[in-house]
Design a protein with these regions (language model features):
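A structural signal for short, well-ordered beta-strand segments and their strand-loop junctions
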Residues: 27-29, 117-125, 169, 178-182, ...
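Short proline/glycine-enriched turn/loop segments at secondary-structure junctions
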Residues: 235-239
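Short, solvent-exposed loop/turn segments at secondary-structure junctions
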Residues: 32-35, 133, 147, 172-175, ...
Length: 253
């Protein structure tokens, strides 16, 4: 276990010596604690309202009103409840998020222009995810976001120009799963299939890439930005909590 940990640490340290263009991702400065709490409050309110909309009111105690305790509830229609539409920030919530210091950093370092509206909702699209312990169906398989932009969202190459993706863990234990990446994989072409799921065309990779991968040990509020063509994947976890994260695409100059 120690050897594995040391190897992982060495891989991360080596990857960090490369430029963003070479590795295809970068870990950004953490959000301020007060900003992280704003996000937790937004998500908690949306979480409780969505459960109430599905007539789920029976919380044993207030702790179960916290998204990180969601896995302790007896929910039979999980996938029905948590469609993407239930997890998209409102326009007001998005505006509040755009006031965060993160966007000044993105403007200075990456030429940030705007948060993209991938689904055509009419305003900057930011959404959150929950991943229960020991539920591999809650995490995404290995993919590049450009595949979804192309097939699921029907975006042209021109519409995808200068798009980058950002993922921020809100509730996470760094050593119990989060986001895995394949550094440098955005510089290669990968074959993949497509399937129809939930009425939409989605990409699917049916093999394990012969390429180095790294699990990023991100802390709550520590964002990672990555190229739309970078191979990455959600990591399942076993710890007694529900992982919560947000993600969005940005357009840069």
């Amino acid at each position: 276990m120690l050897t594995s940990f040391n190897n992982q640490k060495q891989q991360i340290e080596h990857s960090q010596t490369l430029s963003f263009a070479e590795r295809g991702y970068a870990i950004l400065p953490s959000l301020y604690e007060k900003e992280l709490e704003v996000l937790r409050t937004i998500i908690r309110k949306k979480y409780i309202k969505t459960l109430e909309d599905f007539h789920i009111f029976d919380f044993t105690n207030d702790e179960f009103k916290q998204p990180f305790n969601y896995h302790n509830l007896s929910i039979e229609n999980h996938s029905e409840i948590w469609g993407k539409q239930q997890r998209i920030f409102s326009e007001y919530e998005s505006e509040e998020f755009l006031k965060f210091s993160l966007f000044d950093y993105l403007k200075n370092k990456f030429g940030f222009l705007k948060v993209a509206d991938i689904e055509g909702i009419g305003y900057p699209e930011i959404y959150w995810r929950i991943v229960r312990p020991n539920k591999t169906e809650d995490v995404s398989g290995i993919h590049a976001d450009s595949w979804f932009f192309t097939h699921t969202n029907k975006m042209t190459p021109k519409e995808q120009d200068n798009l980058l993706k950002i993922w921020i863990p809100i509730e996470v234990l760094p050593n119990e799963g989060g986001l895995g990446v394949y550094p440098g994989s955005h510089l290669k072409k990968w074959d993949y299939d497509t399937i129809k799921k939930d009425g939409r065309i989605k990409p699917k990779l049916n093999y394990l890439p012969n390429h180095e991968k790294i699990l990023l040990p991100l802390k709550p509020g520590e964002p990672v930005i990555f190229d739309k063509n970078l191979l990455h994947y959600g990591v399942s976890h076993k710890a007694d909590y529900t992982r919560v994260s947000i993600e969005f695409a940005i357009q840069v100059s």
